[in-house]
């Protein structure tokens, strides 16, 4: 596999860039949130938090239709530059927003996301709205039913406006594909947004949406969260059930937003038991709408040292470690300590390969020229490994979970970097070296994220500051098994203490 894009994908990427026209200036590391004479009334609405927007709609100080039109206007102005939202259904959205306002006028019960616009990751099925999965095989695919997460989001009152960009079949952490091209980072338009929920994270960062859904196997909620200075939350396995029948603790859907409070609000709409999924958790999801503020005094924090010897770019560790004092100032007890990650290098890829083989092996056999090399590699590796390899991986996964329970008997949370590198050039598919160390495959450079996946715990990416080059860095906070609420409280306290997440690209 090459470290550059395939000719087909690269041509598509460059083509997408060509139609954007002149590029606006990007935000420097010291630029505050959007402000000044160029700020329009629409921009003021789109910069509000999801929680505040929802409250204003309930108070009838603004309507769902007004909120929708503000976001559509901003999408029209900004999205051609960043390519975050790849399918837009404005007329359908207007009809849904009108119906939402009419329900409110009749005094009907309103869901927690009432009137909030949202675009769904282009991996999940949306009835009547094109769902491409970033693949030419599905470029004209229009599902007839909604995925479970979309059903729950709509039932909670949100207004679907379209789909967000993703790599082909969600493989990789550079959001580009042959259908729509690449998504660009608002802080530096020559850099990637990460992936695979890159379109969603970019849309949030650029105030195109107040909330967005994503999914995560090896970091796909957390990596783009870090690189777009927003919050990406990977919930506990089973917290947000899926209807694909896989029941794997490796992959989960989850919420993304510009604040921890908004993530918690969103989680309250998509969490909850789903009878056909035996792994789904039964906790009342409305509990995630409680106030997050709480004292962190006495909380014991395990602080990252090297995650078992992983290489990190110096700016990643510098920015993260600069936040250690913030936890101490919050009253936490911070000490160097890490889980035992031995054996994860073999076990996680083994189980990951199986998921790709199950989903795409037959399609690849029938359409080999329409699959990118990294997906083909996943399928080939699954066919190379044997039953003993899978059994060992499953055993290591069970062993890891027992170890994690012992680890968190002493600590309330573990803090480590989300990524090992800063956002890289958009014309690079994946880094082949990190801090001088070779990365043989396209997933090796993301071990800091998928090591945490293997812990089977909730994990959140929260803005941690900016590198010397002006690019965002995320802090990854990992909570106890099924301790999603306590983790959100800690992340909220850190967010309030630092305010790193206030910075946004300054598109005039």
Identify the residue ranges that each predicted region occupies.
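N-terminal secretory signal peptides and thylakoid transit peptides that target proteins
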Residues: 1-17
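Gly/Ser-rich catalytic/binding loops embedded in alpha/beta enzyme cores
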Residues: 14, 23, 33-218, 321-325, ...
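A short helix-breaking turn/cap at a secondary-structure junction
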Residues: 28-39, 43, 109, 230-323, ...
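Glycine-rich, small-residue loops and helix-cap segments
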Residues: 60, 115, 155, 159-161, ...
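Acyltransferase
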Residues: 64-69, 98, 287-291, 314-338, ...
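Residue-level signal for inorganic ion chemistry
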Residues: 71, 93, 263, 301, ...
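Short helix-loop capping/hinge segments that flank enzyme active sites or metal/cofactor-binding pockets
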Residues: 113-133, 290-305, 351-405, 417-421, ...
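Short glycine/serine-rich loop segments
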Residues: 145-274, 453-474
């Amino acid at each position: 596999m090459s470290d550059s894009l395939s000719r087909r994908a690269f041509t598509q990427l460059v083509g997408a860039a060509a139609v954007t026209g002149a590029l606006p200036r990007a935000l420097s590391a010291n630029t505050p949130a959007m402000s000044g004479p160029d700020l329009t009334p629409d921009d003021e609405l789109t910069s509000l938090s999801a929680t505040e927007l929802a409250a204003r709609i309930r108070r009838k100080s603004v309507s769902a239709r007004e909120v929708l039109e503000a976001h559509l206007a901003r999408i029209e102005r900004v999205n051609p530059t960043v390519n975050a939202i790849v399918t837009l259904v404005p007329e359908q959205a207007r009809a849904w927003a009108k119906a939402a306002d009419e329900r409110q006028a009749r005094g009907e019960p309103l869901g927690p996301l009432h009137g909030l616009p949202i675009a769904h990751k282009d991996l999940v099925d949306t009835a009547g709205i094109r769902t491409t999965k970033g693949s030419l095989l599905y470029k004209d695919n229009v599902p007839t039913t909604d995925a479970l997460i979309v059903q729950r989001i709509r039932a909670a009152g949100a207004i679907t406006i379209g789909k967000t960009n993703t790599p082909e079949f969600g493989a990789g952490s550079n959001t580009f594909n042959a259908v729509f091209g690449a998504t660009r980072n608002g802080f530096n338009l020559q850099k990637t947004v990460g992936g695979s929920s890159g379109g969603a994270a970019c849309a949030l960062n650029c105030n195109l949406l107040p909330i967005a859904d994503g999914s995560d196997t090896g970091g796909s909620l957390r990596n783009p969260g870090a690189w777009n200075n927003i919050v990406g939350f990977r919930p506990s396995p089973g917290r947000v059930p899926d209807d694909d029948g896989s029941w794997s603790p490796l992959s989960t859907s989850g919420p993304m937003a510009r604040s921890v409070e908004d993530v918690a609000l969103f989680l309250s709409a998509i969490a909850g038991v789903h009878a056909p999924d035996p792994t789904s958790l039964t906790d009342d999801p409305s509990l995630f709408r409680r106030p997050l503020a709480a004292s962190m005094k006495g909380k014991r924090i395990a602080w990252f040292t090297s995650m078992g010897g992983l290489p990190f770019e110096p700016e990643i560790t510098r920015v993260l470690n600069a936040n250690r004092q913030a936890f101490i100032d919050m009253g936490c007890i911070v000490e160097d300590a890490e889980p035992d990650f031995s054996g994860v290098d073999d076990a996680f890829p083994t189980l990951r390969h199986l998921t790709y083989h199950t989903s795409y092996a037959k399609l690849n056999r029938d359409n080999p020229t329409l699959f990118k090399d990294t997906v083909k590699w996943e399928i080939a590796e699954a066919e190379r490994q044997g039953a003993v390899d899978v059994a060992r991986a499953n055993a290591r996964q069970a062993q890891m979970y027992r170890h994690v329970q012992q680890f968190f008997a002493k600590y309330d949370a573990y803090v480590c970097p989300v990524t090992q590198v800063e956002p890289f050039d958009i014309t690079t598919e994946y880094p082949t070296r990190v801090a001088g160390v070779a990365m043989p495959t396209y997933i090796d450079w993301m071990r800091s994220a998928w090591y945490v996946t293997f812990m089977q715990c909730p994990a959140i990416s929260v803005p941690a500051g900016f590198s010397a080059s002006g690019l965002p860095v995320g802090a990854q906070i990992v909570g106890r098994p099924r301790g999603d609420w306590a983790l959100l409280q800690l992340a909220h306290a850190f967010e309030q203490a630092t305010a790193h997440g206030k910075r946004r690209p300054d598109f005039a």
